Amino acid sequence: MFKNLNKKECPKRSKKERKLIFMKITLKDGSVKEVQKGISVLDLAKEISEGLARNATCAKVNGEVKDLRYNIEEDSEVEILTFDNSEDGKKAYWHTTSHIMAQAIKRIYGNSVKLTIGPAIANGFYYDFDVKENISSDDFEKIEAEMKKIIKEDLPIERYSLPREEAIKFMKEKGEDYKVELIEELPEGEEISFYKQGDFTDLCAGPHLMSTGKVKAVKILSSSGAYWRGDEHNKMLQRFYGISYPKASQLEDYLNMLEEAKKRDHKKLGKELELFMIAPEGPGFPFFLPKGMVLRNVLEDFWRDIHRKNGYVEIKTPMILNEELWHRSGHWDHYKENMYTTKIDGVDYGIKPMNCPGGMLVYKSKMHSYKDLPIRAGELGLVHRHEKSGELNGLFRVRCFTQDDAHIFCLPEQIESEIEGIMKLVDKVYKIFGFEYTVELSTRPEDSMGTDEQWNMAEGALKKVLKDMDMPYEINEGDGAFYGPKIDFHIKDSLGREWQCGTIQLDFQMPERFDLTYIGEDGEKHRPVMLHRVIFGSIERFIGVLIENYAGAFPTWLAPVQVKLLPIADAHKEYAEKVKEELEEVGIRVEVDARNEKIGYKIREAQLEKVPYMLVLGDKEKEAGTVGVRSRKDGDIGAMPIDEFIAKVVEEIDTYAK
């Protein structure tokens, strides 16, 4: 079917081969294959390796995700995707399982349920149904059994298209009103594709696996209410969440991780450890409690210190700014639905959803020379963004949060060195917290500002730095900001879950819109380039991630209470106060449990509070001037001179010990 192209000239072919039309396929590893025109992705995978073909779920053809059944008609770059080697590979697998679940539910409940949408998501899939009566979780087992039956049937999955009117008629005959609505809203000329497996057909763009039997281990996880299209004014639907894997052992590992994640839920631990609360009077607006404020302030102090050492200055911009500013920045046109607004003296104002426009005004407040650049201006800025009620989630999804923004204004020739500097800073910060991370490059979205030349230059600069730093990265097509491409950092927590936190965005648009200038060596005005970047992202969200990553047991330097003093009896309280003073003199955060309770009870309480160190103080310790040290991590360490204990804790704090 194909030959390796190891020479520039085409190889000699037989008469039969010369009648065929061949084309060149460039694979991910850079190797070039010569194949027959019109070959399917699946057949290409088989020619490469039977094992690859067995595990393949879809492919990227010239950057676009395609079915295995897709026929390649021209010279192309092709990457065969599997469940294990890419997110797109997982999504095809999970999207197919979503259809299997929908088919099972339709088989069981028939016309009493109507199909809406059922996409793959970050971890698994969901499908929303319009149901006459809510389906109980007691029925999950029955639905899973039907799913397994469909998988065992190994139904071929076929893709076909229909003209608009035929597609509408087809779905009307099936009574699928939501699908009719979706078809009617598709742009003229848009392909209307369907996927069929046995007695089930769904409107879908794909991609999907070749048959239902390719799915192996499945589980329905939960169900909840969800408004049609996320609009609270629409009908409430029932959403079913599920997960699937190629191996039963993978599913078992995932379910075990979910059980552990429940124990680490930041909403649960936030309440137990008295870190934060969400009041019904302020949905999406978190309240930080005293211990939570200690944690937050430690993080912000750490942020300020490390940025000062890396050449940043700190600014603070107002929360409410005139509507005209948001028109100038482009937010009013591209982001207004997420903004809160108000009127002052009859004039419209916007409550800032982002810090950047304020940063533009700070730069513009004085004239700059090329000698001043780069200027690195950081801001811990409180922003507000409207989120729908059903999407709010503890500290992970809120309506107000503090973003650790920085805006770097630089010369064009400084772009690459500044991006590299940011990446090194991000790496340093994440390593302190013990996070591994992956990198993703997000390219131009449909709703963007600027010229093709500007976007190509910006994307090229980001790619060059990633290449020069030997940084592996995935491309996320079309997910850049409206004003420029971006690099996203996804940290991995102790449960293996990924969280998108850090971002670097290259922006040629804002300096243009705000007429930012500097005086060059030639004495003329020039336009600076601007970089947006965050490391934590949202302080609130990052705290939520930390709570779950550490299961509330923060390392000593982060812990709201670092040491708990436990006097055994009233006679030891005075000594406890003396020890407290010595610890506080060097900045150690300490509390005394002076209650008239048994020492075992006090120890258990301190352990539940996840305090790193407990110091038991009795007659022996008082007479010897020592402390009885118990570590959250190592248990009973024994007696230790106060100075020695202080030195141990201070070293842990100063070195950000994990």
Kindly label every feature range from the protein language model:
Residues 18-116, 120-658:
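NTP/phosphate- and nucleic-acid-binding module
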